[in-house]
Amino acid sequence: MISEVLDDIIDKNRNLTVDEAYECMDDLVSGNYPNVVVSSFLTALRMKGETIDEITGLTRSMKNHAVQIDYKPEDYLIETCGTGGDTFKTFNVSTVASIIASAGGAKISKHGNRSVSSKFGGADALEALGVNIELSPEKVINSIDKCNFAFIFAPIYHVATKNVMMIRKQLKTRTVFNLLGPISCPTNVNARLTGIYDPELLETIAKVAMNLGVECGMIVHGFDENGNPAMDEISNIGKTKVAFIDNGDITVKYITPEDFGLSFSKPEDIVAPETPQEHIQIIYNILNNVTTTSQDRARLDLCLMNSASILYLTKKVDSLEEGVIYSRKLIEDGSAKKQLEKIIKYSNE
């Protein structure tokens, strides 16, 4: 299919149908095309601008080629992740938020790889904490059932795209795979909290997510204190643009820390630390409710906002503000800290 459509994409800016995009991904993972053709296809799509149908078709094929995890949630199974590629580097916010929210009953399938834009990614952090990130499908299901959380290490499950990943690294520029990774989780997620590096793409990814079976979700991009695009997650230093998904409807609006019952923080208080050891200490401080400095409080607030969003999307609370109150309680009574211990235990069974 790639050989049939490549000229039209380049010469005519032609958009692909869902089926054509699906077949193109089949071609990409087949290994039958020279690297230069694959590079040309990915670059041509990037220059044209990837459409909802194209991202949908590519993702469906990518998920079909992945190692399957046959987990059928009774209510909501949420994926929490971001694209990376943002400009403002924070600590492992989604990782900590997932630990807290799973302690509150949210079932979470966290799908990811090692660091993309951060200095120390979610997979790196979980591994350093003692979590086994290389789980088989059976162990993923067991971990979700036992402690509401499992990490799905992308390279194990998306083996078919290995050759394409090598080409991506050689290109050293964004491709459609920066968007496919966070939305191609092999579990049957029906809820989603996903950070995107470009605020202009939120509605596009929200529509793709609905095409993939997501019933409720928040596709987000956080801004800095000056209103500049900054981070692929909810922000507590500025406003956050959100595409809310609610059973077939999409609503795009801006939210602020005040919607969570919190105040704005200073950028310097949430910026990523320099070393892995500092990242891990931040996680421990949050789970132990350390609030000594302004940095401690700002980092805690950021995690509370993200945890609150997960709890809200999975219907464990009725509002974002209630989600913050519940998340704070889970930390203060030790539930979140015990949850990390459970995640470590069941991931290593």
Swiss-Prot record:
It catalyses: N-(5-phospho-beta-D-ribosyl)anthranilate + diphosphate = 5-phospho-alpha-D-ribose 1-diphosphate + anthranilate. Homodimer. This is Anthranilate phosphoribosyltransferase. Anthranilate 2 binds at R168. Anthranilate 1 binds at G82, N113. InterPro entries: Anthranilate_Pribosyl_Tfrase, Glycosyl_Trfase_fam3, Glycosyl_Trfase_fam3_N_dom, Glycosyl_Trfase_fam3_N_dom_sf, Nuc_phospho_transferase. Mg(2+) 2 binds at D232, E233. One of its GO terms (biological process) is L-tryptophan biosynthetic process.
